[in-house]
């Protein structure tokens, strides 16, 4: 919300790219929903097989030798400069709070894109979450997030009532 307000107040054009938006699938889902072909949507459930990298770990206790091909300081950027460890790089940085956002941050922008666009969702009015053990350094191994979005202005062929959107990762699945 802060970034949305900042972009509006400064006139800076912002855009979040999503490769899933370039295929016809998203347009078809929007067309079906906007034409009322599946009726009013009141619940959406989205899931991923991620993480496919380690999560739910404590921070490593020892440092590893930094590979000659890696500028660890440059990679770390403005994040906390932890001692280098092979558990962070390559690829696995996604699961560590200092560098990534876990499976939710890595995949939800792609998977939830269609429902957000097709259902014209804004900000949720209520969010509930549950997860496996949550540690301070690393995202949990699995989580479920439930978001409630208020009713939106009806479209010509379909109403947009309050909707419940669920996110599942790490093996947590709908009941």
Regions found by a protein language model. Name each.
Residues 8, 32-35, 62-63:
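Short, hinge-like loop/turn segments at secondary-structure boundaries
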Residues 28, 40, 45-100, 105-175:
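Contiguous beta-strand/loop segments that form the cofactor/metal-binding neighborhood of enzyme cores
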Residues 2-5, 22-33, 52-58:
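Pocket-flanking alpha-helical
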Residues 1-22, 36:
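Beta-strand-loop-alpha-helix segment that lines the small-molecule cofactor/substrate pocket
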């Amino acid at each position: 919300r802060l970034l949305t307000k900042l972009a509006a107040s400064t006139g800076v054009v912002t855009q979040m790219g999503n490769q899933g938006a370039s295929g016809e699938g998203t347009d078809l889902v929007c067309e079906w929903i906007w034409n009322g072909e599946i009726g009013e949507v009141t619940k959406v459930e989205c899931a991923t097989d991620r993480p496919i990298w380690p999560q739910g770990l404590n921070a490593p206790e020892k440092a590893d030798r930094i590979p000659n091909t890696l500028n660890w300081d440059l990679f770390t950027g403005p994040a906390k400069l932890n001692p280098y460890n092979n558990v962070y790089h390559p690829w696995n940085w996604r699961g560590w709070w200092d560098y990534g956002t876990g499976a939710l941050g890595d995949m939800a922008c792609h998977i939830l894109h269609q429902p957000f666009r097709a259902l014209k969702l804004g900000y949720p009015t209520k969010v509930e979450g549950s997860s496996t053990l949550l540690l301070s350094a690393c995202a949990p191994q699995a989580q479920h997030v439930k978001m409630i979005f208020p009713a939106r202005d009806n479209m010509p062929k379909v109403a947009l009532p309050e909707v419940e959107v669920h996110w599942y990762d790490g093996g947590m699945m709908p009941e």
